[in-house]
């Protein structure tokens, strides 16, 4: 049995927090692992309402005199090498390219092994001077949750084809780009809809609603389209329980991931696990698993980051690079997905390997590093 100490932001109501909880779920309930966990905090956004519904007290109360493996998950400048224990593994999310100025690689190089979730993240670290061992291991999921027995979330009496996206309203997620492509490609008479589930850190519901409404109107104005002639998107704002998100996945048809930068893309993977068509930006995190063989790829170009959104002073700076999707390519792939036949869809779904995202696969990959 392996004694493992896991340090991560599992108490946060953030993307990293949800990833950390997935790690713990996979590691903690494996009979070959004696798990101890300790929290670390990167943001003030805590899961105070226990949105996850998890009770990890048994792992928090647990401790060992010696750990075979110490896993640290988070932002690299917080990584510390624990020389008194066994193998030191770090797991980190690398969203952008050209990150040498952050100093992150210097911390990572102190570790025995670094785990990233995508080829994009691996290339970024190597470009920045990575010297330690690196492995690509996707995040784990409880595959039994991905079924069709969820209650419906909305009425779809006309059997419209529903595109959707789940993510924060921030520059890297490129929601304006998605809106632009949808407004240009589909009109009110088309049986296509767009649902966006989003939120904005630091803003209450009313403030976020005003900002997002303005942005939608601004996109219409820039494109010079008449709001009366386009299909208005349905925007869901705020934080919702995971059950709600699963119901949304289950009822929609095609997930559109137009992110400019991401390390993994959990929502895109969840959509694929629900047997939904997925469109993703080429080279970013989710493209390591979803491509033209089992989904749809958006053409994009490497450009300098221009973003007002950052969680640390040296992140998402103009010195970094991300992948800017071409609007015409987003439109083209949305049209292809919309026109996909049942046979074509089944073939794409068949080509997506779900087993690599299982909790068992994750544990085996970590133990065998």
PLM features: residue spans?
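Acidic anion/phosphate-binding donor-loop and adjacent secondary structure
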Residues: 103, 140-159
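Short hydrophobic beta-strand element within catalytic cores of glycosyltransferases
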Residues: 277-280, 296-297
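N-terminal pre-catalytic "stem/leader" segment of glycosyltransferase-like enzymes
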Residues: 1-67
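Nucleotide-activated donor-binding/catalytic signature segment of Leloir-type glycosyltransferases, i.e.
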Residues: 205-243
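Conserved donor-binding/catalytic core segment of Leloir-type glycosyltransferases
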Residues: 5, 155-173, 179-182, 194-196
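Extended catalytic core of nucleotide-activated donor transferases of GT-like folds
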Residues: 5, 44-128
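A charged, aromatic-enriched C-terminal amphipathic alpha-helix characteristic of glycosyltransferases
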Residues: 321-332, 339-368
């Amino acid at each position: 049995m392996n004694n493992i100490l896991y340090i991560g932001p599992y108490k946060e109501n953030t993307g990293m927090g949800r990833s950390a909880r997935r790690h713990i779920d996979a590691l903690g309930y494996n009979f070959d692992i004696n798990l101890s966990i300790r929290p670390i905090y990167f943001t003030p956004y805590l899961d105070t309402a226990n949105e996850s519904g998890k009770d990890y007290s048994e792992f928090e109360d647990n401790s060992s005199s010696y750990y075979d493996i110490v896993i640290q998950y988070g932002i690299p400048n917080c990584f510390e090498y624990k020389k008194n224990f066994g193998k030191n593994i770090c797991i980190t999310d690398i969203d952008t390219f050209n990150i040498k100025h952050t100093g992150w690689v210097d911390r990572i190089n102190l570790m025995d092994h670094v785990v990233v979730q995508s080829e994009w993240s691996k290339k970024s670290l190597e470009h920045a001077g990575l010297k330690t061992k690196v492995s690509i291991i996707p995040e784990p999921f409880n595959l039994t949750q991905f079924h069709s027995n969820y209650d419906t979330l909305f009425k779809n009496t006309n059997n419209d084809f529903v595109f959707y996206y789940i993510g924060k309203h921030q520059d890297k997620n490129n929601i304006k780009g998605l809106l632009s492509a949808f407004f240009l490609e589909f009109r009110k008479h088309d049986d296509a809809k767009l649902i966006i589930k989003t939120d904005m850190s630091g803003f209450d519901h009313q403030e976020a609603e005003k900002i997002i409404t303005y942005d939608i109107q601004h996109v219409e104005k820039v494109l010079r389209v008449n709001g009366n002639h386009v299909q208005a998107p349905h925007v869901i704002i705020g934080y919702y329980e995971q059950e709600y998100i699963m119901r949304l996945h289950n009822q929609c048809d095609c997930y559109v991931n137009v992110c400019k930068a991401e390390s993994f893309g959990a929502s895109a993977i969840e959509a694929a696990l629900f047997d939904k068509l997925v469109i993703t930006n080429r080279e970013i995190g989710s493209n390591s698993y979803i491509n033209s063989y089992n989904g749809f790829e958006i053409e994009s170009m490497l450009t300098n980051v221009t973003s007002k959104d950052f969680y640390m002073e040296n992140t998402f700076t103009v010195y970094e690079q991300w992948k800017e999707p071409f609007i015409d390519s987003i439109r083209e792939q949305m049209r292809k997905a919309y026109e996909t036949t049942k046979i074509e869809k089944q073939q794409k779904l068949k080509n997506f390997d779900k087993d690599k995202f299982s909790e068992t696969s994750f544990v085996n990959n970590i133990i065998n590093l």
